[in-house]
Design a protein with these regions (language model features):
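ABC ATPase nucleotide-binding domains
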Residues: 225, 229-262
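The feature captures the beta-strand-to-loop junction immediately N-terminal to the Walker
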Residues: 34-36
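Conserved ABC transporter NBD signature motif
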Residues: 57-68
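Helix-to-loop junction immediately C-terminal to a conserved catalytic motif
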Residues: 49
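Catalytic Walker B motif of ABC-type/P-loop ATPase nucleotide-binding domains
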Residues: 160-164, 169
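Conserved ABC ATPase "signature" region
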Residues: 98, 113-131
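Conserved structural motif at the start of ABC-family nucleotide-binding domains
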Residues: 3-5, 17-20
């Protein structure tokens, strides 16, 4: 199911955060939202999961305007792994993952046999089934992210929205999580801070700067030396990763303005 933003503008306390933003994330592909801090990545994602309502423009999942459907239906359309989600640390892992079934249940409805099977599958797909009886507080950062991903998978939504999913994780946990997300095959839109992660794991990227779309295409096409200089103020180039053979970004800080591409 495609994800589309059309002419989205957001102003908060007199400051324009997003200015006429449009993009489309293709069905079954991983699309990265990239840009410097303050470029509007997280705000754009929050428009899709109904935290921030655009003053102008629309956001769609498939044919559904996410602000015109009931909250329960919105929860069936997209699952979210947000930054720094607060949870009661005393919850057991399985209980947290089972929360993903709430959009599919009526008020006060108990967990069904089908719900339990879906939770089992989500735990397995996120490779955290071994911890289902553990308390959330006892897990490492990478393990907690897998639990939150499993909860999202339990929603059985066609679209996955991720806001800085590798934040605060060590490098091994980062790579494991990104590999897992790629393997899921879901339509995924992820705000990413690490440009090399975007290069390696995204099918397409949307580059934001000062709340506007600078470019949207495959990572190699978007992350040119000129754009890296203009948007991020660094010297950069695409090379071939010596271990994977895939495109890989390398960076260097400019010693002077003259060293930036013109």
């Amino acid at each position: 199911m495609r994800v589309t933003a059309t002419g989205v503008s957001v102003t908060i306390d007199g400051t324009t955060i997003l200015d006429d933003v449009s993009f489309t994330a293709a069905d079954g592909r991983v699309t990265g939202l990239i840009g410097p801090n303050g470029s509007g990545k997280s705000t754009l994602l929050r428009c899709f999961y109904r935290i921030i309502r655009p003053q102008q423009g629309t956001v769609h999942i498939g044919e559904h305007d996410v602000w015109r459907v009931p909250a329960r239906r919105a929860g069936q359309l997209r699952a979210v792994v947000a930054q720094d989600q607060e949870l009661d640390n005393e919850y057991a892992v399985r209980d947290i993952v089972a929360m993903g079934r709430i959009p599919h249940q009526r008020l006060l409805e108990r967990e069904s046999t089908a719900d339990r099977a879906i939770v089992d599958e989500a735990l397995t797909r996120a490779r955290i089934e071994w911890a289902e009886g553990r308390r959330f507080v006892t897990l490492s950062g990478g393990e907690r992210q897998r639990v939150l991903l499993a909860r999202a998978l339990a929603q059985n939504a066609p679209v996955l929205l991720l806001d800085e999913p590798t934040n605060h994780l060590d490098i091994g946990a980062q790579l494991e999580l990104l590999e897992l997300i790629r393997e899921l095959g879901l339509t995924t839109v992820a705000a990413l801070h690490d440009l090399d992660h975007a290069m390696s794991y995204c099918d397409a990227v949307v580059l934001l700067h000062h709340g506007r779309v600078v470019a949207a295409d495959d990572p190699v096409t978007v992350l040119t030396p000129q754009r890296l200089a203009d948007v991020f103020g660094v010297r950069g180039a695409t090379t071939t990763h010596p271990l994977t053979g895939q495109p890989h970004l390398v960076f260097a800080a400019p010693r002077s303005e003259r060293e930036l591409p013109r």
